[in-house]
Amino acid sequence: METMRAQRLQPGVGVGGRGTLRALRPGVTGAPTSAATPPAGPPPAPPPPAPPPPPLLLAGAPGLPLPPGATGSPAVLREAVEAVVRSFAKHTQGYGRAVNVVEALQEFWQMKQSRGADLKNGALVVYEMVPSNSPPYVCYVTLPGGSCFGSFQFCPTKAEARRSAAKIALMNSVFNEHPSRRITDEFIEKSVSEALASFNGNREEADNPNTGIGAFRFMLESNKGKSMLEFQELMTVFQLLHWNGSLKAMRERQCSRQEVLAHYSHRALDDDIRHQMALDWVSREQSVPGALSRELASTERELDEARLAGKELRFHKEKKDILMLAAGQLGNMHSSSC
């Protein structure tokens, strides 16, 4: 019984072979889904997904003490980030020292670990440069919990791109420590009310875990006491499952929303999930040529827009990585068939 339940909760969307393990994997093998091409007639409206979490930091989350104008122009964003970096350096390194923001970010997370933070993969901050032979250079930084940020300025050198990514990541890391960033009863009520207003929902939906907003409330309550960055890391898994069509497939396999939430609330985003989703996009591309390139172009635009706005990027970055993995698998298949 437990084995069958675990199989039904696999993140795949397979069509056909309903009782097989492959049909329950994260991908969407077989006929393409609406993400690849619209059906001939109007598609049935799927049950609403869980509303997204309250926006992080620079998107103006409720209760967050942002520097004045932090959500405004790029110039104001730069000024706000610099102010937070200087403030952090003043309190940790004293006056008169030049700020090495890359070292400061690493020091921040090592300090959190030394104070008892549960960092399952250690306190190492990881940087990734986008390959390029000319400016502007782009760098991404992944924090120990999985949150991702990127250089938000025009960077003429690779070193400057690294510093830019470190600055926005440090700002978010510091702000995430503020009490207003913790999920409390008051925060839950405010977030659910905002979700109801955004989705034109009613109060009964918020109390029903089988609705999207009810599931959102359930997730918030299950993560009470955690910070918003920690919650965003969890939500990334569900965002990817929704994007790939996996949540819809699980509903078709008679998985309850509570089962899905309980299962994936404790499962980290891993290479198995990425690989299975990539296989789905290989299948989509084979069924509808051009589907992969269109999705990749759209994802790259979204990633660049979010990066330049100083937003958390993991969802967009994971989407791009999955699509690039699919493109690589297609290339290997073409090479082997020649």
Curated annotation (Swiss-Prot):
Spell out the Pro residues composition-biased ranges.
Answer: 39-56
This protein's source sits in the domain of life called Eukaryota
- Annotated Low complexity bias: 29-38
**GO biological process, alphabetically ordered:** autophagosome maturation
Q: Which parts of the sequence are annotated with region: Disordered?
A: 1-65
The protein's matches in Pfam families, at most eight in alphabetical order, are given as: LIX1 (PF14954)
Supply one GO CC term from the record. cytoplasm
What InterPro entries does the entry give?
Autophagy-related_EPG5, LIX1
Q: Which family does it belong to?
A: Belongs to the LIX1 family.
Q: Which PANTHER family match?
A: ECTOPIC P GRANULES PROTEIN 5 HOMOLOG (PTHR31139), PROTEIN LIMB EXPRESSION 1 HOMOLOG (PTHR31139:SF6)
This chain belongs to the protein called: LIX1-like protein
Native species of this protein?
A: Rattus norvegicus (Rat)
Classification of source organism:
Eukaryota, Metazoa, Chordata, Craniata, Vertebrata
